[in-house]
């Protein structure tokens, strides 16, 4: 997902690059749905709102550590900028989980934009003598379905269905599509930790043959006794489990994530470039709020009263 780098990674965006699919942020307004038979107290709870700025802008710094590519056994750590931008429009919202709008005016369905970016790979031992992997950018639509909400709106279950087109910077240009449908759980005030948000997601990954070939194929001219020729075919690309925590203070935001990748059963698992079938990656970031709109909008309150008042 993007030029947002650490800000998105800390909220669950994953790799083949710096970041990817988002965990739902608490900052964007949500449309409330209430059971007509719910008790008055529960209705009052779900109707509670607070006034927040129409937009907020911030900047910070973070660090991420991840493999050169999925399946690599080489890990690098990078400092990354942490842009912070929130927009709470009626029909269009932007937050750390991306740009989104309501689809067909349905409360339970949203149309989002899914983004991702990767760093170049130049000195990987498994790819010695092969062309470097260029930085890539991925962009495409994502359908987000709100499956379930608790009465207090503090626990949310979503299903996300993204598909992105991937482009290598420079040659070869378009390298195919990538998709990672996932189940996403977002919890406000987990374990009584007021103001914190915990996000967890898991799901399979799929890619086009052209996409997998970019990372895992070995052309005959680059074959060696220890690295035989190999042609990636595309299809199932493994699975991921991710957890992220974040908290918004009056003047700054902080977040961190940890992710586990499993490549067992992936269509390319027998590629000589795959050196690790499972591994962990992580990141942390901070951002300071430097400007905000004077105009206020009402946002459903999913935080405990004391936290709401402190902000």
Predicted stretch roles:
Residues 55, 75-81, 107, 133-139, ...:
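Residues that define the transmembrane beta-barrel architecture of outer-membrane proteins
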């Amino acid at each position: 997902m993007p030029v947002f780098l650490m800000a998105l990674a800390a909220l669950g965006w994953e790799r083949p690059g710096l970041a990817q699919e988002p965990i739902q942020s608490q900052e964007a307004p949500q449309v409330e749905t209430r059971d007509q038979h719910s008790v008055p107290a529960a209705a009052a709870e779900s109707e509670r709102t607070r006034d927040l700025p129409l937009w907020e802008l911030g900047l910070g710094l973070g660090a991420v550590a991840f493999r050169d590519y999925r399946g690599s056994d080489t890990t690098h750590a990078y400092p990354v900028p942490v842009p912070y931008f929130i927009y709470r429009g009626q029909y269009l919202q932007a937050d750390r989980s991306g740009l989104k709008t309501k689809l067909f005016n349905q409360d339970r369905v949203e149309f989002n934009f899914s983004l991702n970016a990767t760093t170049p790979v130049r000195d990987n031992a498994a790819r010695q003598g092969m062309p470097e992997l260029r930085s890539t950018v991925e962009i495409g639509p994502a359908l987000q379905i709100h499956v379930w909400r608790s009465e207090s709106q503090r626990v949310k279950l979503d299903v996300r269905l993204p598909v992105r087109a991937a482009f290598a910077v420079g040659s070869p240009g378009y390298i195919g599509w990538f998709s990672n449908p996932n189940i996403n759980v977002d919890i406000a005030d987990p374990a009584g930790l007021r103001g914190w948000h915990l996000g967890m997601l898991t799901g399979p990954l799929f890619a086009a043959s052209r996409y997998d070939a970019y990372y895992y194929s070995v052309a005959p001219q680059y074959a060696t006794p220890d690295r035989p020729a190999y042609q990636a075919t595309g299809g199932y690309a493994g699975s991921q489990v991710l957890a992220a925590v974040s908290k918004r203070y009056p003047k700054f935001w902080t977040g961190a994530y940890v992710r586990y990748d499993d490549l067992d059963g992936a269509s390319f698992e027998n590629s000589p470039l795959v050196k690790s079938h499972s591994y962990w990656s992580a990141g942390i970031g901070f951002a300071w709020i430097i400007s905000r709109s004077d105009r206020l909008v009402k946002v459903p309150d999913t935080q405990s009263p004391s936290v709401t008042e402190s902000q």
